[in-house]
Amino acid sequence: MAAGVAAWLPFARAAAIGWMPVASGPMPAPPRQERKRTQDALIVLNVSGTRFQTWQDTLERYPDTLLGSSERDFFYHPETQQYFFDRDPDIFRHILNFYRTGKLHYPRHECISAYDEELAFFGLIPEIIGDCCYEEYKDRRRENAERLQDDADTDNTGESALPTMTARQRVWRAFENPHTSTMALVFYYVTGFFIAVSVIANVVETVPCGSSPGHIKELPCGERYAVAFFCLDTACVMIFTVEYLLRLAAAPSRYRFVRSVMSIIDVVAILPYYIGLVMTDNEDVSGAFVTLRVFRVFRIFKFSRHSQGLRILGYTLKSCASELGFLLFSLTMAIIIFATVMFYAEKGSSASKFTSIPAAFWYTIVTMTTLGYGDMVPKTIAGKIFGSICSLSGVLVIALPVPVIVSNFSRIYHQNQRADKRRAQKKARLARIRAAKTGSANAYMQSKRNGLLSNQLQSSEDEQAFVSKSGSSFETQHHHLLHCLEKTTNHEFVDEQVFEESCMEVATGNRPSSHSPSLSSQQGVTSTCCSRRHKKTFRIPNANVSGSHRGSVQELSTIQIRCVERTPLSNSRSSLNAKMEECVKLNCEQPYVTTAIISIPTPPVTTPEGDDRPESPEYSGGNIVRVSAL
């Protein structure tokens, strides 16, 4: 070991000064230190085809997670000796790095919902995300939650929910989303018009309109045309009252609606009118009445229901409540500090207007907000110095929260823009689907009128095949099975109605049809998948059938009917071979299935004939089993 180090020492010194000496002989092998890992093993993690390798000790650092516990054995494949996870390999890189470094990072280019799903799958909580990424993660998560909430509200007020809505829900939906119906849109514009009229009237009634007869002093328009303004105010208040009562009646939660900000604004907007009706016109209450009339200006906030920009501003102020609280707290501290300093700095001046600390509040507020009315100015040198410091500190204190408020406003604005775009795309997509359905139906009806469907059926065989395709699949399979049995056995299966018609033709002396009544001879029957078996003819006497067609029907010997929870029934030979009208009707109303075993007597010596139909007009001598549907 020492010899190896001594051999490497000249090369290490040469590398330290930037050059390498020429070796006279081959360099010795570097010293190796065997790494002993008795309990640690190399684990291969296959994530959707991407292989990751790490040590078992690395994963077991966090035993409360999926990879660090024994639960990962559920994903082990003995054939490949790998742990297979059908997850996103890009996000898994950051999860595996958490096991290696102990720090979890949030990839900015990944979807926040997919990232949360991966963390939940592997048993990691978002609170362990590093400080470098946690704030951005919270912002993205909040935006996603708001977007999902907007989508849920849109789906709840969508057109698809109209058939299941009650009248109360329809009214509330019309108020919240006026574009759902024509009447809601008309009421929306009517209320907006009366809000504008009310605000304009509240402003115009204070404008001087000249003096009335008998008065020298000019009167405001509200007093000179009191009747006109009263009627106008009454009409506006009636509209606002009806709107408020309808909203209150249709609100999903009346308690939450009454406590909402917009509900309070509506009450404050209409309450002064009703109080003014019951108040007497005297000097004692005139001051209170004037104070109540001031609250009519709050009607302008009703425009927030009609303006998306005002709603975005309200959402911005609500989301920036913490920043605004910090701004207010900082201004309050600065105002108190600088007002106290300015009072004591100007206390020695006789011409100073800083008579008290509360009186100095006005100067501090005006200075920190950079207004500078000039009604109060410092006279001493110390007062001017502290006034300059107060002005500079005001700029810094006010400017700090402004970027946060602007960024929140921009975020909420773009979020609403995306929501409007998604709603427009969804509406256009539904319109295209509706148009496609209508166009397809119209095209089908037009082609049917033009006879395009009938022209496709060029022959009777094609028409029969078309009818058979449109029939029941069960019936088609049933005929196919009987057809295969007819081909592979020496029996012919005849439809019950065809068999009775053939018997009636023979009984009346008419010449039966030349073709066989079996299913194989009928048109429209599909080809069988089984090969034909050589058929043999049996002649068996039948006492219950007329002599003209006695040899065409095989006699049934006995039938055993096994019923569920009943004793087996046996029918006689005569009843089995009786005519259809003499048979007892089957009871098909029972809830159980009846199993019937038909035994056919052993045929006598066979008389081989041709494989095809016989030349005689009678039916073939093959065994004909009459099949009925149970």
Curated annotation (Swiss-Prot):
Residues 2-20 are annotated as: Interaction with KCNIP1, KCNIP2, and other family members. A motif (PDZ-binding) lies at residues 627-630. K(+) binds at residues 370-373. Zn(2+) binds at residues 105, 111, 132-133. Residues 308-321 are annotated as: S4-S5 linker. PANTHER family: POTASSIUM VOLTAGE-GATED CHANNEL SUBFAMILY D MEMBER 2, VOLTAGE-GATED POTASSIUM CHANNEL. This is A-type voltage-gated potassium channel KCND2. It comes from Mustela putorius furo (European domestic ferret). The gene is KCND2.
